[in-house]
Amino acid sequence: DLNGELRRLCARQLHLVSPKEADKFYEAWRKSLLFDAPYKFDAFMTYIELDRKPEKRFYAPRRHYLKPMVQGFQDVLDGKLRLLTISMPKRAGKSQTGINFVNMLSGKYPDRSTLMEGTGDDLVKSFYNGCLEYLTTPNEYLFYDVFPESRLVQTGADTKIINCLLYTSPSPR
């Protein structure tokens, strides 16, 4: 993966060059991550939180142990798996990672249905609110940088439904 190699090289250079040069390597690293974010779940998870304060980020501080689960979701995305089952302790990040995967699918395929389910109304409500948070706080999450054509068009708190639509700009006359 050439783009991943570019990111590794940029990350390595960040620690070896002057602050001014480091800014350029950081921007190259960031653009490379954005390039992969619509296709690679790990890149998506990393990129959408880049503008959040480090202490508020979900994925970056947990990446070392979430990576196998993220790879499982990537295998589903790539068609290598039809079913992914996850067994991890409570509070390990399963639900939040699942929310991020549903958001990625909703952005990538806004004209298709995406389903997330859970046992109990409180859990389902937290899924709904978690998904919605990424779509309604663009100053904190970079979802629309990754999927600029995807737009939130409707929500239903009672039914816990979120509808996205593929937005195409009107053609000039």
Language-model features: where?
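Conserved beta-strand position immediately N-terminal to the Walker
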Residues: 84
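Conserved P-loop
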Residues: 87, 94-140
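Conserved small/polar residues in nucleotide/adenosyl-binding loops
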Residues: 167-172
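N-terminal accessory segments
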Residues: 1-81
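Hydrophobic side chains in beta-strands
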Residues: 88, 162-163
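Short mixed-charge
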Residues: 139-162
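A generic structural signal for short, solvent-exposed coil/turn residues
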Residues: 78, 108, 152-154, 164
